[in-house]
């Protein structure tokens, strides 16, 4: 049933905040675990094996927690991708049941690390009822992720896992370490050596499809144990011909001829000898005879000769050598003298009295 306190936008915002907070915590805890490995190597070098084992348990706890955070980050991302189903449907979609129940179950266990996770769980409980939230917190509904529950459990890590952590740390830092022979002898057969479980299903572990083998046999999914691969078909042997028998083409495969006549075989060709090369080389014509024949054949051709292409008009050639210049007068050496009747000044030619008289006459007429 639809809860009254559900707010879709608040759920969306807090889902994004949870993803960002989880990414930061994963990075921080991974860096701290790398530094702690150096301290464990120092303990092993100093001979403090028991102290190193206790520190390894802390590292395993942190690695478990980082893996659990990665699972929660994946579920938050899934809810954001399918947020339309949460808004539109009143009932819980079957594809979101594991994500919703796992987030509600993990909220009280990680709310000290991620405070926004509690808000997400409260909004989901308001959406799908408080009774559903109680069932998820106790896992009575049975949809909480088992792998996440194992990573966040309070049980101590296996002793064989602690020893293998110590072996790998000593190998990386070149520190001599002798593992506990009692613990190594009690290790069950087939225990995984790595901490992070990649989550293989039973079908893959029992012989599912290979991972990029490149040419090997791929067993079908869900095949029973002990299934033997089907052998590859072998090519049929070809009959070897006898060295003395003549070559013959094989009979054509397919329906028989419509005429009903038997199909014959091609027989080998009889022994045909190549022609003999003559003892004396053949005579050839000389070069002079060939040239004479060409001249005769060209003389026998009768007909109008093809006209030559018209040449473009050529530009007239200027003959600068035959050009005659006219005879010019010589340059005078002295300045010309003024004539006797010419006036030397322009002011002497103007009669001002005559001009004033004529001006007065004009004034009187007007």
Curated annotation (Swiss-Prot):
The keyword Cell division applies. Residues 337-347 have a biased composition (Low complexity). Residues 306-315 have a biased composition (Pro residues). It comes from the Eukaryota. Disulfide bonds: none annotated. It is found in: Cytoplasmic vesicle; Cytoplasm, Cytoskeleton, Microtubule organizing center, Centrosome; Midbody; Nucleus envelope. The modification Phosphotyrosine is found at residue 43. ESCRT-III-like protein involved in cytokinesis, nuclear envelope reassembly and endosomal tubulation. Is required for efficient abscission during cytokinesis. Involved in recruiting VPS4A and/or VPS4B to the midbody of dividing cells. During late anaphase, involved in nuclear envelope reassembly and mitotic spindle disassembly together with the ESCRT-III complex: IST1 acts by mediating the recruitment of SPAST to the nuclear membrane, leading to microtubule severing. Recruited to the reforming nuclear envelope (NE) during anaphase by LEMD2. This is IST1 homolog.
């Amino acid at each position: 049933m639809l809860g009254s306190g559900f707010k879709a936008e608040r759920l969306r915002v807090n889902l994004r905040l949870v993803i960002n907070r989880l990414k930061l915590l994963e990075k921080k805890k991974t860096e701290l675990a790398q530094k702690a490995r150096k301290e464990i190597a120092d303990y092993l070098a100093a001979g403090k094996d028991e102290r190193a084992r206790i520190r390894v348990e802390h590292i395993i706890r942190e690695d478990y927690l980082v893996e659990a955070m990665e699972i929660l980050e994946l579920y938050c991302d899934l809810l954001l991708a399918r947020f339309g189903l949460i808004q539109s449907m009143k009932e819980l979609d079957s594809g979101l049941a594991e994500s919703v129940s796992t987030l509600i179950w993990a909220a009280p266990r990680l709310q000290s690390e991620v405070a926004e996770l509690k808000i997400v769980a409260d909004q989901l409980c308001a959406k799908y009822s408080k009774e559903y939230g109680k069932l998820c917190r106790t896992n009575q509904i049975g949809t909480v992720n088992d792998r996440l529950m194992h990573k966040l459990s309070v049980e101590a890590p296996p002793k064989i896992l602690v020893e293998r952590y110590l072996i790998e740390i000593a190998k990386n830092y070149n520190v001599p370490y002798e593992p506990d022979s009692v613990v190594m002898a009690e290790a069950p057969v087939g225990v995984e050596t790595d901490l992070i479980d990649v989550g293989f299903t039973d079908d893959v572990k029992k012989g599912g499809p290979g991972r990029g083998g490149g040419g090997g046999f791929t067993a079908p999914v869900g095949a029973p144990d002990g299934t033997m691969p089907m052998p590859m078909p072998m090519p049929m042997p070809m009959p070897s011909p006898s060295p003395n028998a003549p070559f013959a083409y094989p009979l054509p495969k397919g329906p028989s001829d419509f005429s009903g006549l038997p199909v014959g075989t091609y027989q080998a060709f009889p022994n045909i000898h190549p022609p003999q090369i003559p003892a004396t080389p053949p005579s050839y014509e000389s070069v002079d005879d060939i040239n004479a024949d060409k001249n005769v054949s060209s003389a026998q051709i009768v007909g109008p000769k093809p006209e030559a292409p018209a040449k473009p008009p050529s530009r007239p050639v200027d003959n600068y050598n035959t050009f005659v210049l006219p005879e010019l007068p010589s340059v005078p050496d002295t300045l010309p003298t003024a004539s006797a009747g010419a006036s030397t000044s322009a002011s002497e030619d103007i009669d001002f009295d005559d001009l004033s008289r004529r001006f007065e006459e004009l004034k009187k007429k007007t």
